[in-house]
Amino acid sequence: SEGTSCYIYHGVYGICKAKCAEDMKAMAGMGVCEGDLCCYKTPW
């Protein structure tokens, strides 16, 4: 599932990774990520 696109909320998408970069936020428990984290940046 590494590299899969994950949807956070309207207009914000992330990418599934085992570990997120320090400048990115992490959302755990997303089905599409199959146990990985969804790493994303907010646009504001």
Curated annotation (Swiss-Prot):
UniProtKB keywords: Alpha-amylase inhibitor, Disulfide bond, Pharmaceutical, Secreted
Spell out the subcellular localization from the entry.
Secreted
Keyword field contains Disulfide bond: yes
Q: Where is this region: Inhibitory motif?
A: 7-10
* Molecular functions (GO terms): alpha-amylase inhibitor activity
Q: What is its main location?
A: secreted
Listed disulfide bonds for this chain? 6-38, 16-33, 20-39
Specify the domain of life of the species encoding this protein: Eukaryota
Q: Would I find Acyltransferase among this entry's keywords?
A: no
Q: Which GO terms describe its cellular component?
A: extracellular region
Q: Anything else of interest in the record?
A: A synonymy between H.magnifica and R.crispa is controversial.
Query: What family is reported?
Result: Belongs to the sea anemone alpha-amylase inhibitor family.
What domain comment accompanies this record?
Answer: Is structurally homologous to beta-defensins.
Q: What does this protein do?
A: Mammalian alpha-amylase (AMY2A) inhibitor. The recombinant peptide inhibits porcine pancreatic (Ki=0.17 nM) and human saliva alpha-amylases (Ki=7.7 nM). It does not show antimicrobial (tested on fungi and bacteria) or channel modulating activities (tested on 18 voltage-gated sodium and potassium channles).
Protein known as = Alpha-amylase inhibitor magnificamide
